[in-house]
């Protein structure tokens, strides 16, 4: 299959993956309206073309939390990444390091902290959920610090799981799920050889290390469901802010008032995110939520954004809407599933090229030059009017 654009990797991943894995990463919550709006709303945003600018010294470099990045992109935390390619978290982390950007390890990764951190020559980021088991949370934080992690991404938009109806149809959950997954693996031999046989152990490394026993897919679903904590509040996070001495980012902000609370709480950054449309269907797309949040807290806190970003043009759009940087989730997992570490490197190369074209043709020599002036104002007024 020819890969000429960053968006080509989705089809390549679908060919290679068993359906239960493809639809797990590809799907969203309920009717998937927010999932679709995330990409559609970004695509609808018109960039403002400018000409005859001297763009010979264009640079994508930026800094986030004191860390130099080759471009304003971070690989987002994605659970079960190690099921999409052999030791997938390690491969993705190496690709990110090669391109000079951070990789964020999920709490529910296949590869544990202690396997991923030594594989790269720059500190990775670590993501943690709010869970009832505070002992696990503290243990994970201690292990992350011991592994040299400096930046913590704290996900707060999962006090309860969203209903992901696709999973029941695909075999991730539902009747006879284990048998359906086994049949799918047999009919996808490339994945079965690379990951199914040679990518073991297939458990959640970070969770298994704490529990002292392997954590299978069924164990993962049960353990995570039992540990969601709907009682969590800002006050409950105080001990984490005191414990964690490095940058702390709150992920899952969609409302300006919550963004202001994050500033008052003492967070160093936020991620404007609807969890890729995987939690509450019907909420605003990130592209529609971001401008009001940026108006409320820009300059007081570092703003990242995710959900719906598939190309370098989308990165430029998000920055023009008010983000300081973006996180890529599905996009890198598609590339990882299709072609491993090399696929993620190529994806990031494509995104970099797309950003350079967009910046050149909008007259932005640096990331700081990408502002609301980079957008056609009729588009901006439509966003502001929601």
From Swiss-Prot:
Pfam families, sorted: FMN_dh (PF01070)
Highest taxon listed in the record's lineage: Bacteria
Binding site for substrate: 24, 129, 164, 278
Entry membrane topology: Peripheral membrane protein
Reactions catalysed, as given in the entry: (S)-lactate + A = pyruvate + AH2
Swiss-Prot/TrEMBL cofactor(s): FMN
Record GO biological process: aerobic respiration; lactate metabolic process
Residue numbers binding FMN: 106, 127, 155, 251, 306-330
Subcellular locations according to the entry: Cell inner membrane
InterPro entries, A to Z: Aldolase_TIM (IPR013785), Alpha-hydoxy_acid_DH_FMN (IPR012133), FMN-dep_DH (IPR000262), FMN_HAD (IPR037396), FMN_hydac_DH_AS (IPR008259), LldD (IPR020920)
GO cellular component labels: plasma membrane
EC number: 1.1.-.-
CDD domains for the chain: alpha_hydroxyacid_oxid_FMN (cd02809)
Family per record: Belongs to the FMN-dependent alpha-hydroxy acid dehydrogenase family.
The protein's name: L-lactate dehydrogenase
